[in-house]
Every structure is written in C-alpha cells, then in structure tokens.
Amino acid sequence: MKTTAAMLWEKLRDGSVEQRAIEFAKTTLPYLMVDPMSGSRGVVEHDFQSAGALLVNNLAAKLARSLFPTGIPFFRSELTDAIRREADSRDTDITEVTAALARVDRKATQRLFQNASLAVLTQVIKLLIVTGNALLYRDSDAATVVAWSLRSYAVRRDATGRWMDIVLKQRYKSKDLDEEYKQDLMRAGRNLSGSGSVDLYTHVQRKKGTAMEYAELYHEIDGVRVGKEGRWPIHLCPYIVPTWNLAPGEHYGRGHVEDYIGDFAKLSLLSEKLGLYELESLEVLNLVDEAKGAVVDDYQDAEMGDYVPGGAEAVRAYERGDYNKMAAIQQSLQAVVVRLNQAFMYGANQRDAERVTAEEVRITAEEAENTLGGTYSLLAENLQSPLAYVCLSEVDDALLQGLITKQHKPAIETGLPALSRSAAVQSMLNASQVIAGLAPIAQLDPRISLPKMMDTIWAAFSVDTSQFYKSADELQAEAEQQRQQAAQAQAAQETLLEGASDMTNALAGV
C-alpha cells in the first residue's frame, strides 16, 4: 500500500510533544499554539499571570534586533577562492568585486524585510523560545515569510539532527483552492463540495543526488497529488525547520521556557491563589453579639436612622485575609520573577528604536550568548544561514549557479561573528598599548630588536599579523620608490648648487 502524505503526517506527529508545547504556551503566549484546524477564532485559555508574556516578548524582540538588525546586512558574501580566480581571469580589481558583493548583500537583506517579514521572523523566535520548534516558508515570488507551529506540521530527523521529512497540514475551504488543484482533483474523480473543507498536505523530503543532497516537494489532497512539484539543492530549500535546542536522537526541539518551567509553574499557581485570596480579603462580614441585646434580623433590615436594640460593641466588622501572609507570598513571587528576568534578558541595555547601532547589536549578542549558551549559536546555523542562501538566490539569477555549488557562500555577520570581530579588535588594542609602553626600552638598549619584541607581543595576544604585514614585493617596491625619490632629491640638490655657483661667478665678474 502506498504511503500517502496524510498517513505520514499521522505517523510523524508526536502528541506528547504537542501537549507539552500547549502547556508551555499557556504560561506565556497561549495564542502561539491555537489549533489552526478549528476554522474560526480559537478559544485561548489564559494564565493568572502575564509576566511570562512580558518576558517572552522582550527576549524575542531583543533576539530579532540582534539576529536581523534593520539597516545592517546580517550576512556577508565571502570572497572565496573561486571568486578570486574568476576575478583574476577577467582582470577585475578585487575591490570592485568586494563592493559588488556588498551591494548584493544589502539588496538581499532589504528584500527579506519587505511585506512585514520581520514581524513573522519575530513570531518564529517566539515559537522557538516557548515550544522549541517552528516551520517557516520563504515565498520568493511574493517576498513574504509564513510561519507555523507544531499544530500544523510534523518532522522526522536522523541521528545527527538533520531533517529528513517535513509534512505540513493546512485546511482550506474548497472554494479557496487553486484552480490547478481543483482540476487535478476532478481528473482523479474527486468531487468537491462548495461549502466543505479539505486538508492540503505538503511533503518535503531530503534525498541524495549524485553530486549533492536536494529537497523534493509535492502537494496532496485526499490521497491525490495536486499542483506542481518542486526541487531545490538542500541549502536553497525555502522550507526551514529551526529548533531552539535539539537533543541527540530527538525529532523535535526543546524551548527556553521548558528550562524554567518550574518557576513558571510556581508563578502561575501562586498568582492564582494570591489573586483569589486577595479577592476574599476584600469581603467584610458584620459580627453580631446577640448576648448584648443585638438581633441579626433587626440590623439586616434596618434603614438609616432606625432605632435597634444593642450596644456599641454588639456589632463589629470582620475582614478576611492576612496582610502578612499576602506580603510573604508577594515576596516569594518577586524572587521567582527576578530569576526569570535574568534568564530572559529582561533589562534596559538597548534602546527601543527602529535602528540600533552595531555596538548595541554586539552588546545584545554578548548578553544572549552568556545567558542562552550555545542556543544563540545554533540559531545562526539553522535559521540565519538558510535564510541568507534563499534571499541571495532571489536577488540575481547570475548568482544561482554559484550558490548551488557553494562557490558563493554567505557568512553570518551578526551574533557570535560580531563578538569574534569585537574580541579581535580588542586584542589588537591591548597589544598596541603594551607595545607603546615597551617601545622606549629599545632606545635605551641597542641590543633589543623592536620588530622581534613586537612579534612576541602580537603572538601573546593571539593577533594574526599576516593580514597586516606588507609582502616582500611591496617592501621591495617601496624601497625602490624611496631610492628613486632620494636620487631625484640628490639631483635637484646638485642642480640647485650648480645654479648657485654660476650665479656667484656671475656676480664676481661684475
């Protein structure tokens, strides 16, 4: 029996993973896991606290600004050996090639940010933080990005964590289907009801080719393949399945919220109980002492100014609740919130602006790497890099062949690479300060070689000086130029002296 996409969907789904994701979303952003198959506005069950939503929104916004900063390309096309050889064969200046690559990078980045795609990427980051999983699709024709939660897709991975199968399930009204899909269904003998709904399955499978791996796609409705099929090199596949943290051997990732679910559970439970206790404490009961002549019915039915039996102390108000107990609970909640604030980078170290500086991006990247560990590095590999390849393929068809063979490769510029560049510059500054302090020693002791001392200091600070030192040919050319300048200066001096001598002789003859 042939395995259909619907059968594969049921096989690859993991109900326990989906249920855990729903619980994690409930304590933070419940709408992330709303069932898209409901066909209407889904019912969202909210928690008794909103701190989780605040923390996730804050962390997602920071990561989005750091990973995809507006106005700054998040990747840079590498000047590979293949590109250098091509430039040499065409006798093209390498600086012109570098400038052209930079223009391509900017154009690709600008295209990514069209049609509110940054908002969708922020949504993807929220899904990763809360559930650990997300599926996004880059539509190159429309220049848009679409994202789905675990409710809409299933995935299978191999032992190394590479995805092998992706099955996306979407529900459409029959009347909203593409005409091409309708024609394919009619040819297969399937009748569509105008008011009914159908499930559209999209299956993306990783396959091995003779030269490289590729992704193959087809659509299916009711066991019938519909529409056009697709095929891309695996690194140019527009379907991307990033994870927040993927354990070896697992098909689905784990989110940041799961690491702190204990604190979120305590925050939720105490917030609920404290809220109910505070409401109860607002109620006031009147205690009536009938031994002192007071009658409950008399006080219950009395109007203002009525005369009733009793004494001044026969009735007293009683308020429920204990202030000290509520203060202790609030203090415990505050301790939980402080821990979560630190874990979710809740602080005001970056301006809330449309454009941020490169230094602010670097600071956020450093804080994220220190707080989130290797997860931040993982996002560059399974989210940024695939998007960079796809966006570059949209800019210029001439780049496509180079992208397919990976002769044209994008290098991620934000995140950890920004930290590495900053660390390299800081090492150079530190080494320069040490050299400036030790340089006078070479003047005091003629036995000391200043270049050798500088080489030792550069090496101690792990500074690669090969990219700064002049080549032997450059040094020889400069020496030759200096000799020519010296010869010209000598000739000019001799000419000046001869002219002065002639003038002196002429004056003496007068």
Curated annotation (Swiss-Prot):
GO cellular component, one term: viral capsid
UniProt key word Transcription: no
Compartments (UniProt record): Virion
Location (main, coarse): virion
Superkingdom of the organism of origin: Viruses
UniProt key word Signal: no
Signal sequence, start to end: none
Record's keyword terms, sorted: Capsid protein, Viral capsid assembly, Viral genome ejection through host cell envelope, Viral genome packaging, Viral penetration into host cytoplasm, Viral release from host cell, Viral short tail ejection system, Virion, Virus entry into host cell
Xref: InterPro entries: Connector_podovirus
BP-aspect Gene Ontology terms: symbiont genome ejection through host cell envelope, short tail mechanism
Subunit note: Homododecamer.
Similarity comment: Belongs to the podoviridae head-to-tail connector protein family.
Role description: Forms the portal vertex of the capsid. This portal plays critical roles in head assembly, genome packaging, neck/tail attachment, and genome ejection. The portal protein multimerizes as a single ring-shaped homododecamer arranged around a central channel.
Designated name of the protein: Portal protein
Source organism of the structure: Pseudomonas phage phiKMV
